[in-house]
Amino acid sequence: MRPNIVTEAGVQTRVGQWWNAIPFLTSSVVVVCGVIYLICLLTGYDTFYEVCFLPSAIISRFQVYRFYTAIIFHGSLLHVLFNMMALVPMGSELERIMGSVRLLYLTVLLATTNAVLHLLIASLAGYNPFYQYDHLMNECAIGFSGILFSMIVIETSLSGVTSRSVFGLFNVPAKLYPWILLIVFQLLMTNVSLLGHLCGILSGFSYSYGLFNFLMPGSSFFTTIESASWMSSFIRRPKFIMCTGGNPSSYIPTYSAQNTTSSGFSTGNAWRSLSSWLPQREASNQSSEDSRFPGRGRTLSTARDPTAPAGETDPNLHARLLEDSSSPDRLSDATVNTVADSRQAPIANAAVLPQSQGRVAASEEQIQKLVAMGFDRTQVEVALAAADDDLTVAVEILMSQQA
C-alpha cells in the first residue's frame, strides 16, 4: 500500500462532497461550459467568429442566437476556470433561494438584457453623428463573465452588507464593489470586454431596483413548468431545487459581521420577504417574545396550557428564575418543586398531553417543502421538531446552521 493513499482518498472524498453540494442548474452550467471548452480544445476550434457576440453581425444578418452562444464559449483554460469558480458560490446561493427553474429563467433574462444593452451602446458609439467609434461594433466577445457581473450586483444588493473585500486585500463600500472589480479586471487582464462587463453591471442594477419586475412571471408559471411530465426526470435528481413560490429578491445569507444598511434590501426586510411566502400558522403573541429566543416558549413539568396568554405567568416561577442559579442545590430544589407542582394537578396534565402529542411528528408535506429548498432531510426533521412544526422558525434554524 502506498503511504499517501489516505491523503489521495481524503482529497477525492472532499471534492466529491463539494461537487454534490452544488445545486442542479449551477453544476449543469459548469459541466456545459467545461465540455464545450474541451471539445473546442480537442478539435482546434479557436476563432469563435461564428458564435461570439458580434454587434455588426447581429445587426446586418440578425444573428440573435449570438446572445446565448457567446456566454457558454470561453477562449482559454484560465478564462473558463475563473468564471466557473466565481459562478459556483454565487449561483449556488441564488439557486437555493430561487429554485432551479427560476434561476434558469433569470440567467436567460440577464443574458438577453446584457446583449441588448451591449448592442445599443455599440450602435450609439458606431453610428452617432458626432464621433463614430467602430471598434465596439466589430468586437467579438465570449464568456460567462457578463452574467457573473450581474449576479455580483444582485448578490451585493440583496445581502445588505456595507463593505466587500477585493481578493482579500482591502475592503470597499458594497455599492462600489462591482465598479472596483470592473476596473481591476480591465487593468490586470488583456482582451477583456469592458462593454460586456459594464452591461452586466447595468443589468444587475436594473434587476435590483425592480426595473425587470414586469419581465418576471409569477410563481404559478414556474410551478406549471415543474409539474410538466417532461420535467419529472430532472425533478427526481437530488440536487434539483423546486421553486417554492418565493420572491426572487428574497434573503441571501451573508457571512459579514456588519450586516446593516440603510437601503431597502436590508437583511431584516429580506428575511420577512422570505417568511411571507411560507405557510403560516394562526396568529400568536410573537410581538411579546424576546428577540434573543425566537419561537414558541414551553414550560416543562407544569399544568399550564402552553397556548395560554403570555401575561398569565406564575409569580413563584419568576421568583425562582430570578434567584442566583450558580448553586447546584438551588437548581435541584427548583426542579423538585416544579415536579411536585406538576404532580398536584394530574387531571390538568392529562388534558394537555393529547394536545401536545398531536404535534410531535412533522407532516410529510412540511418536510418535503424544506427538502425541496435544498436542506438535508435529517436536519429538516430535527429543525421542525425544535420549532414545533413552525415552518418559519424551522427555516431560520436551518439557515443559521448553514451560516
UniProtKB/Swiss-Prot annotation:
It is a multi-pass membrane protein. The lineage of its organism: Eukaryota, Viridiplantae, Streptophyta, Embryophyta, Tracheophyta. CDD domains: UBA_At3g58460_like. Residues 361-401 form the UBA domain. Its main location: membrane. This is Rhomboid-like protein 15. It comes from Arabidopsis thaliana. Belongs to the peptidase S54 family. InterPro entries: Peptidase_S54_rhomboid_dom (IPR022764), Rhomboid-like_sf (IPR035952), UBA (IPR015940), UBA-like_sf (IPR009060).
